[in-house]
Amino acid sequence: MTTRIDTRFADLKQQGRPALVTFVMAGDPDLDTSLQILKALPAAGADVIEIGMPFTDPMADGPAIQAAGLRALKAGTTLKKTLGLVRDFRATDNATPLVLMGYYNPIYIYGVDAFLADAKAAGVDGLIIVDLPPEEDEELCLPAMKAGLNFIRLATPTTDEKRLPAVLANTSGFVYYVSITGITGSASADASAVGAAVQRIKRHTNLPVCVGFGIRTPDAAQAIAAQANGAVVGSALIDALKASLDAEGRATKGTVGAVADLVASLAAGVRGAKQAAE
């Protein structure tokens, strides 16, 4: 199967440049604004969009993304409504890859088969589920592949040579390398260490490797993207969104623009990086 993710990375490889992968939380700060933000991202320079599925117990997320999830839940965002956002986005954009990112519990409650069918029909391309290790591939990873969705795995600095083949075995789309240990948004990534780690992963897979956690500025995005096939930015976008809200936490006229402007500057940084050697 060839997904939008595969097509996008193949196109970027031909262009000789890395991807900018952006993360936003579905329904933050409300569903209407969230849809406007999603629609603004590709024009601002996002190549792939990760959409967070709000969850009440997001253990791998730092304070910014946790707060975004709480805002989304408060606004009434559910997994069904998240899929509705994807459907609405697809009405005007059939090319930009969309990846749902989050935890297994809401999917389990929704029902795996129903979720996969609805996600595929809505226009989802891939999943990143942070709390399902390879040992549990039968739960969701293998059914997702059968449904035509990429299942994207996280690798970390502590994923050793012995563990990597298991992590990569059923991975598709791209590999998401978490450049620092800990929670999202908590430190900055070191470009030279990232480069060595990406090369280590590439000895085990032909998939693109994208690097996330700790990228907040165009310069950092450029430095990291130069070492990989893409840079993932999340917490910095959530912070920009939050800074644009009013005292009650509601969207203002500047909310969509605040996120889009930061994405445009990050995209310029990433586009200034040459594609890492394959």
Swiss-Prot record:
Stretches that traverse the bilayer: none
UniProt catalytic activity: (1S,2R)-1-C-(indol-3-yl)glycerol 3-phosphate + L-serine = D-glyceraldehyde 3-phosphate + L-tryptophan + H2O
Pathway: Amino-acid biosynthesis; L-tryptophan biosynthesis; L-tryptophan from chorismate: step 5/5
InterPro entries: Aldolase_TIM, RibuloseP-bd_barrel, Trp_synthase_alpha_AS, Trp_synthase_suA
Pfam families per UniProt: Trp_syntA
One annotated GO molecular function: tryptophan synthase activity
Cellular component, GO annotation: cytosol
PROSITE patterns noted in UniProt: TRP_SYNTHASE_ALPHA
Keywords: Amino-acid biosynthesis, Aromatic amino acid biosynthesis, Lyase, Tryptophan biosynthesis
Record SUPFAM superfamilies: Ribulose-phoshate binding barrel (SSF51366)
Its EC number(s): 4.2.1.20
Active site, per annotation: 50, 61
Taxonomic superkingdom: Bacteria
Family the UniProt entry places it in: Belongs to the TrpA family.
PANTHER family: TRYPTOPHAN SYNTHASE ALPHA CHAIN, CHLOROPLASTIC (PTHR43406:SF1), TRYPTOPHAN SYNTHASE, ALPHA CHAIN (PTHR43406)
Assembly and interaction partners: Tetramer of two alpha and two beta chains.
Function: The alpha subunit is responsible for the aldol cleavage of indoleglycerol phosphate to indole and glyceraldehyde 3-phosphate.
Record NCBIfam families: trpA
Protein name: Tryptophan synthase alpha chain
Species the sequence originates in: Rhodopseudomonas palustris (strain TIE-1)
Gene name per UniProt: trpA
